[in-house]
Amino acid sequence: MKNVLILGAGGQIARHVINQLADKQTIKQTLFARQPAKIHKPYPTNKMQTTSGKKVIQDR
């Protein structure tokens, strides 16, 4: 299984990439966005997790 990190997951280009990879069961997506609420639904059917910029900064 390949892991793919999508930076800026709330943007328009990322939306297209997320949809392109959604049907591929051999890919696990990690979506990174400053505002996770802007990540477009429906979420992909393959394995996926989301994280936000604030969380990463606070975890340091």
From Swiss-Prot:
Signal peptide: none annotated. InterPro entries: NAD(P)-bd_dom_sf. Residues 40-60 are annotated as: Disordered. SUPFAM superfamilies: NAD(P)-binding Rossmann-fold domains (SSF51735). Missing about 170 C-terminal residues compared to orthologs. This is Protein YmjC.
